[in-house]
Amino acid sequence: MNGKYPQKRAGNPAYFGLKLSGNYRLPSLPQAYMATGHNSAFISSDDKRYIVYHTRFENRGETHEPRAHQYLINEEGWPCMLPYATGGETASKSGYDKSSIVGEYYVVNQGNKIDKSIAEPEKWVFTEDGFVFGQGMDGTWEAKDGTYYVHIKTALPSEDGTVDAADSYSGVFCKMKDEAGTDVMTFSAVGNNESIWGVKYNGK
């Protein structure tokens, strides 16, 4: 399974592929998930796509447990792994009302490094007029009418006060249950050779 692989960042071959999941912490998880590996992917009889893997946990040594996450395909054909273990969710192919999307999200960026660092959640706010802002970041978001597709552009201010070129992410929305059983709106998107996940809580 050694490369070369096409990159999400550009079309040039590389010796690594798009990182879907790493070490991360999300609301409803009692501990950070770590070393999410030994992956298998399959398509079920009802045409849903899944990734099955084992995960270790922060401060629990070699203890590990299996998990299965559904993944969806974005508008450009790239896989987007949903943030939480599957609970039988079915994404609405016709999309979601804007009122169920706008609000405050906890967002993790899986990055592209392979090390022991944990991706910690940051708060992003999606506004009704198509803007997104968070910790030292602002940008735009757009849901494609009649689909669950979303396109997000973010930019970080540089040290000289200017704004760096925006990063673009293409992904999907899906309403699902977190691992505490709470119904939440989520998104998963990929771009810049990175995967980002967002989870909205309490109608904020």
What are these regions (language model features)?
Residues 1-204:
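Carbohydrate-active catalytic/glycan-binding domains of CAZyme proteins
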